[in-house]
Regions:
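A glycine-rich phosphate-binding loop feature that marks nucleotide/adenosyl-phosphate handling sites
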Residues: 353-358
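Formylglycine-dependent sulfatase
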Residues: 1-306, 314-342, 346-349, 361-370
Length: 370
């Protein structure tokens, strides 16, 4: 079951506009709301229209609504927005990215798409304001994952799985307040249900409500947040698991003897909708540029365990898994990850096989809590 199944009994109309990457429809029975492109790799993205959002929001004054607007930017092929706002030569690239001319050009295009998306968010909020329902509506803004640069999307580094979460609810949530509370995606549904007046105790959710954090009644939420990556069908199997307490991140690469290959990111032709022509420049420069070699090797050849003090090493470039001074921290996080995997029925590497992937596509999961 999904969001529509749980909010509909509380009287909510539940709609979705934009990108849809979930199926079958009977498991995710959102009302389709028109106006935003559903294809995240179209070049260019189709112009968006706001009439569908306005109609959905205002249609029934007696029934509340929940609307997901899944914007497709920023996403390869990074063609929307005005990249001239970000001169490539003036950019400061993060240390986990190789510094090549093509990378700078693509990073500028990526930033332009973020700016384009930010403008869309403003337009959506104006539609809400014009409906007269803004003061009674909780708005959550978050992202799916990190950027499509090596070491980000399709990884369990912080730059791959840690995204921002912004909330607005006039009169209920204090504007400008920040919190270090640790939450994860699984917590969003029970949070919405709790705020909508539902009883979250009657269902065994993977997450738990952080409504008290939003309302300023609590400063902390969960002890740990977890992540995983199974690489099939994006490339050869390369299962990864991670846990963070908000300050430290522990990563476990379950097949460290393998090299990591991601078929889209490493696309060489540069003409496909998911290919990244900058990757070829990383490979080209790795033989004579020590930093480029370092980030290419970091991406493709990973140790069994990684431990990062993320609070002081934002891009997680210093692996401290072998540091005896922080052995207790590694043991604590590793134990927490073990307990979570057991609770999820996660066997580890066997999950990332063609057989397990095909079974999941057919709804016949080989693993998990039965």
């Amino acid at each position: 079951t999904s969001m529509p199944h749980h909010l509909a009994p509380l009287g909510y109309r539940v709609g979705l506009a934009g990108k849809v990457h979930v199926k079958p429809r009977k498991a995710f029975p959102f009302e389709e709301v028109k106006g935003f492109d559903t294809n995240c790799v179209r070049n260019p993205t189709r112009p968006h229209r706001l009439e569908g959002l306005g109609e959905f929001i205002k249609r029934d004054q007696k029934k509340p609504f929940c609307l997901v607007v899944a914007l497709v930017e920023p996403h390869i092929p990074w063609v929307m927005g005005d990249a001239s706002q970000y001169p490539p030569g003036k950019l400061k690239l993060p240390p986990n990215i190789a510094d090549t001319v093509r990378t700078r050009q693509d990073f500028a295009a990526y930033l332009a798409e973020i700016t384009y998306m930010d403008g869309q968010v403003g337009e959506i909020l104006r539609v809400l304001e014009e409906s007269g329902k803004a003061k009674d509506t909780l708005v959550l803004f978050t992202s799916e994952q990190g950027s499509q640069f090596p070491g980000c999307k399709w990884t369990n580094w912080d730059t791959g799985v840690h995204t921002g979460l912004i909330a607005r609810w006039p009169g209920r949530i204090t504007a400008g307040r920040r919190t270090d509370a640790v939450v994860q995606y699984a917590d969003i549904l029970p949070t919405l249900l709790a705020l909508a007046g539902g009883d979250v105790s009657g269902h065994s959710y993977d997450g738990r409500s952080f409504a008290e954090v939003l309302l300023g009644q609590e400063d902390k939420h969960r002890k740990y947040a977890y992540g995983l990556h199974n690489n099939i069908p994006e490339g050869p199997r390369y299962p990864v698991r991670t846990v963070t307490d908000g300050e430290w991140r522990y990563i476990r690469n379950l097949l460290p003897e393998e090299i990591y290959i991601e078929k889209h990111l490493m696309g060489m032709k540069g003409t496909g909708v998911l290919n990244n022509p900058y990757w070829a420049t990383w490979v080209r420069d790795s033989w004579n540029n020590p930093h480029t070699y370092k980030v290419v090797r970091r991406y493709m050849r990973r140790p069994a365990e990684q431990l990062y003090h993320t609070a002081h090493d934002r891009y997680e470039m210093n692996n401290r898994a072998g540091d005896p001074d922080v052995a207790a921290i590694k043991a604590r996080l590793s134990g927490g990850l073990d307990r979570w995997m057991k609770a999820q029925g996660d066997p580890g590497a066997p999950q990332d096989t063609h057989r397990a992937h095909q079974a999941a596509r057919e709804g016949k999961h080989l693993y998990g809590v039965k």
